[in-house]
From Swiss-Prot:
HAMAP family: TrhO (MF_00469). It comes from the Bacteria. One of its GO terms (molecular function) is oxidoreductase activity, acting on paired donors, with incorporation or reduction of molecular oxygen. It is an enzyme of class 1 (oxidoreductase). Its EC number is 1.14.-.-. It comes from Prochlorococcus marinus (strain SARG / CCMP1375 / SS120). This is tRNA uridine(34) hydroxylase. PROSITE patterns: RHODANESE_3. Keywords: Oxidoreductase, tRNA processing. It catalyses: uridine(34) in tRNA + AH2 + O2 = 5-hydroxyuridine(34) in tRNA + A + H2O. InterPro entries: Rhodanese-like_dom (IPR001763), Rhodanese-like_dom_sf (IPR036873), TrhO (IPR020936), TRHO_N (IPR040503). One of its GO terms (biological process) is tRNA modification. NCBIfam families: PRK00142.1-4. The keyword Cell cycle does not apply.
Length: 321
């Protein structure tokens, strides 16, 4: 299903497309396909990342509208069994520094064998039905994202597995999930993530582990924010995204969070006003992690980026903090 944020186009010259599909892709077509993507990206000033594996494709790209359209035509040439889940948004500046197109073992890395979302996944929950799952006392709602993402925003009552990477999620399932289900006799599990890809793969894992009633939010948080009116929304905070917008508000526009470019952690306005925060140099998360020599390197990096910004104004929003 294609979702469009056409209302954001005013005064925003760059289009962002986030997409994925769990569909089998033949090894013989991957190398040629990636080469064609690189050619299109170079021609049309499209940046971002596209990952392709035997299990499917996953990516986020940003560029002029005509460039993103050209890329999508190439994506469509794969003729996937499961259509791409695509979400669009707009920004006033380029959201990525470069373009990468790579062949990977997994399009989202879980690191567990015999989990195949091409064959088996949980049941989709459409955004308009999600609030009912949040309210259901017999449904355990789980945020499959990482701790630093959840710190920016989440749904009230959702379980936080406190993982630092998606690779840690299977271990959390093995050690914690059974006991959580027994505590309140939950009958269903409902998973969610940013755009749908991690919770879809997580649902395949849970089904393999024998959990019977597994659901996941179709299109993830981003589609929920797009389709559910703000006055009906149960979302709190902002949604962390893996590009230089850092986090999006309910209108799917860049919010108030910035990124510490020393350690990569998201920073709230309160964090940005903290005594340890120096833009692009350090924050309260990393003040004790780096030496004075490190900080001097960060300052030199920032001076270099500033010079590039003077040469190429408006071409990138890196860095923001």
């Amino acid at each position: 299903m294609i979702n469009s944020f056409e209302s954001q186009k005013v005064d925003n010259d760059y289009k962002i497309a986030a997409f994925y599909s769990f569909s089998p892709i033949a090894e013989k077509v991957i190398t040629t396909f990636l080469s064609k993507l690189r050619i299109i990206a170079e021609k049309h000033n499209v940046r971002g990342t596209v990952l392709v594996a035997l299990e499917g494709i996953n990516g986020t790209i940003c560029g002029p509208v005509e460039g993103v359209t050209a890329m999508q035509k190439q994506l469509d040439s794969l003729d996937l069994e499961t259509p791409l889940e695509i979400k669009y948004s707009y920004t006033s500046r380029q959201a990525f520094r470069r373009f990468k197109a790579r062949r990977k073992n997994e399009i989202v890395t879980m690191g567990v064998e015999n989990v195949d979302p091409c064959k088996t996944t949980g049941k989709y929950v459409e955004p308009e039905d999600w609030n009912a799952f949040l309210d259901d006392p017999l449904t355990l709602v789980i945020d499959t994202r990482n701790e630093y993402e959840i710190s920016v925003g989440s749904f009230d009552g959702a379980v936080n597995p406190r993982t630092d990477s998606f690779r840690e999620f299977p271990e959390w399932v093995d050690k914690k999930l059974h006991s959580l289900l027994k505590k309140k006799s939950f009958k269903k599990i409902a998973l969610f993530c940013t755009g749908g890809i991690r919770c879809e793969k997580a649902s395949a894992l849970l089904l393999r582990e024998g959990f019977p009633e597994v659901h996941h939010l179709h299109g993830g948080i981003l589609r929920y924010l797009e389709e559910v009116p703000e006055n009906e929304s149960r979302w709190n905070g902002e949604c962390f995204v893996f590009d230089q917008r850092v986090a999006l508000n309910h209108k799917l526009m860049p919010g108030v969070y910035k990124l510490c470019f020393a350690c990569g952690m998201p920073l709230s306005p309160q964090d940005q006003n903290g005594k340890y925060y120096i833009p692009s140099i350090q924050c309260h998360h990393c003040v004790d992690l780096f030496s004075d020599d490190d900080r001097e390197r960060f300052r030199e990096r920032q001076r270099h980026i500033a010079r590039l910004g003077e040469r190429f104004p408006g071409n990138s929003i890196w860095p923001s903090a």
